[in-house]
Amino acid sequence: MRVAALISGGKDSCYNMMRCIAEGHQIVALANLRPDDNQVESDELDSYMYQTVGHHAIDLYAEAMALPLYRRTIRGRSLETGRVYTRCEGDEVEDLYELLKLVKEKEEIEGVSVGAILSDYQRVRVENVCKRLNLQPLAYLWQRNQEDLLREMIASNIEAIIIKVAALGLDPDKHLGKTLGEMEPYLLELSKKYGVHVCGEGGEYETFTLDCPLFKKKIVVDTSEAVIHSADAFAPVAYLRLSGLHLEEKVSSVPGDDETTSYIHNS
């Protein structure tokens, strides 16, 4: 099946792409929703649906994976927030519809890779959009045991770093920029102590993937800056602004056509 992958830059969307390929599907394009650059704090958008921290680095995915990348600015807001989603003009879900509609027209996709694990809110809305476009959602991580998933991601050579913290026990000074492998023991400890979701499904943390077996090049962070979003004494919210990045060549672990053209389509 020809598949477009919804990517946030995080570990979950990356690992679900790997699972899609393992199941015999072909990733032919990447799709991402981004905040408006004119917003004062465009790094961190208040959205129920989309991870936006790290969005400045998403363009590198097109070159790293040698795939076309389609991006759309999020124009809507979270308006229809009930358990069942009904098409609602001005809702941010309609931005996803317009994005995938374009990708389907351009790339003739049949399915969509979705990295959702636990959020019914996200699942219901992605399924609504896919049904309207006659696309098959592929969510191989859905309701998997999170400890197992984290272990699998690390074992699968996904190199992802923590770029946002928002939970009791996570310290911006100590944990921003750490890799999943470095954080695994501590995340398991926090899960036992405070009930923290080890994959961050409760919003405890977010990640950005620098390398994985699907990348033909790896992303390298040259400079970054920690930004405090909320200075709560017990659970501060902070994120890492990736201000300087470049790509480095690597030995490709993905058999494929070296002639593949990457390009970015913004709307």
UniProtKB/Swiss-Prot annotation:
It comes from the Eukaryota. Its EC number is 6.3.1.14. It catalyses: diphthine-[translation elongation factor 2] + NH4(+) + ATP = diphthamide-[translation elongation factor 2] + AMP + diphosphate + H(+). Amidase that catalyzes the last step of diphthamide biosynthesis using ammonium and ATP. Diphthamide biosynthesis consists in the conversion of an L-histidine residue in the translation elongation factor eEF-2 (EEF2) to diphthamide. GO terms for biological process: protein histidyl modification to diphthamide. Pathway: Protein modification; peptidyl-diphthamide biosynthesis. It comes from Rattus norvegicus. GO terms for molecular function: ATP binding; diphthine-ammonia ligase activity. The keyword DNA-binding does not apply. CDD domains: AANH_PF0828-like (cd01994). This is Diphthine--ammonia ligase. It is an enzyme of class 6 (ligase). The modification Phosphotyrosine is found at Y97. Keywords: ATP-binding, Ligase, Nucleotide-binding, Phosphoprotein. Belongs to the Diphthine--ammonia ligase family. Pfam families: Diphthami_syn_2.
